[in-house]
């Protein structure tokens, strides 16, 4: 399924750029209508188990939309655009399907087929079912008991899974080595800079700064001498250095939390950083020529 989704995404990238440019809402619509529908095919049968490859496809798509670097962690990408893991939707579909099948007692063939699926191996059957219910804080017995009482559980289980994956994501952000600042700029809803119409390229620039792409100090996998400022060649290229210490930039009067805030108050300063880097690269290129 991941291969099919990647193929569709590859086709979408080309004409999506031509038709919609950087329009965030239209690209979200493309994902929902074309790519996600492919990834969710047959989820009623495999939705108990989280599919890491499919989650990776979704994160890759949103990195592309926001112009983020490939090393941006998936949990930061999902938090920035406020999208759930695909497992939430897949689990809901499986639970709803199970409830519909078990509610059709007159269809014996369908009932027997479903019993065999639940008893299957490889995470699609009983083990996957148990893991799913455990993840959302229920036992299989508790869910089955409530269903016998006529209570539909899919909405409650979907809500619980959404809360669980949100807690998991926030926990990963707290422990992040790549972007430890991000925890302090998390928003409860979609960041306001993404909600404003127009300036799509500006949104991508802000997203890169917020998600840690425009610093080198946080690239812990690089050598120390590779993490220096690209403008002045001095200290490690952190946001604090760029704001207060870099000789090639004017000292900014606001703090980094305001610069990275959801309203993008530091947008003009970000443009200055990007433009100054581009001018420096052009000078260095001319010098080499």
Predicted regions and their residues:
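Non-catalytic, peripheral interaction segments enriched in hydrophobic/basic residues
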Residues: 1-120, 128
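N-terminal regions of proteins, emphasizing targeting and processing segments when present
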Residues: 16, 61, 87, 177, ...
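Intrinsic low-complexity/disordered segments
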Residues: 8, 55, 82, 162-164, ...
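Conserved aromatic-histidine-acidic binding/catalytic patches
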Residues: 23, 27, 49, 170, ...
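Family-specific functional microsites
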Residues: 19, 184-289
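Flexible, low-complexity interdomain linkers flanking nucleic-acid-processing modules
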Residues: 93-204, 260, 273-276
């Amino acid at each position: 399924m991941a291969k099919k989704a990647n193929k569709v995404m590859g086709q979408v990238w080309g004409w999506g750029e031509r038709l919609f440019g950087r329009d965030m809402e239209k690209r979200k619509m493309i994902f929902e209508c074309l790519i996600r529908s492919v990834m969710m095919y047959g989820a009623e049968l495999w939705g108990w188990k989280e599919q890491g490859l499919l989650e990776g496809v979704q994160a890759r798509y949103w990195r592309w939309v926001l112009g983020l670097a490939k090393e941006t962690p998936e949990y930061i990408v999902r938090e920035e655009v406020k999208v759930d893991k695909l497992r939430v939707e897949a689990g809901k579909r499986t639970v709803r399907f199970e409830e519909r099948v078990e509610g059709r007692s007159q269809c014996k063939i369908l009932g027997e087929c479903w019993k065999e699926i639940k008893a299957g191996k490889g995470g699609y059957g009983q083990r996957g079912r148990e893991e799913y219910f455990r993840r959302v804080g229920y036992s299989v017995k508790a869910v089955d008991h409530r269903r016998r009482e006529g209570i539909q559980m899919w909405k409650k289980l979907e809500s619980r899974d959404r809360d669980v994956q949100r807690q998991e994501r926030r926990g990963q952000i707290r422990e992040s080595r790549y972007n430890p600042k991000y925890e302090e700029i998390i928003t409860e809803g979609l960041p306001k800079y993404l909600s404003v119409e127009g300036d799509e390229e500006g949104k991508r620039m802000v997203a890169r700064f917020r998600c840690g792409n425009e610093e080198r100090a946080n690239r812990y996998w690089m050598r120390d001498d590779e993490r220096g400022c690209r403008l002045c060649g001095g200290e490690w290229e952190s946001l604090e250095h760029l704001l207060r210490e870099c000789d090639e930039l004017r000292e900014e009067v606001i703090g980094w939390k305001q610069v990275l805030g959801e309203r993008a108050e530091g947008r003009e300063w970000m443009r200055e950083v990007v433009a100054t880097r581009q001018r420096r690269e052009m000078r260095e290129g001319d010098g080499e020529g």
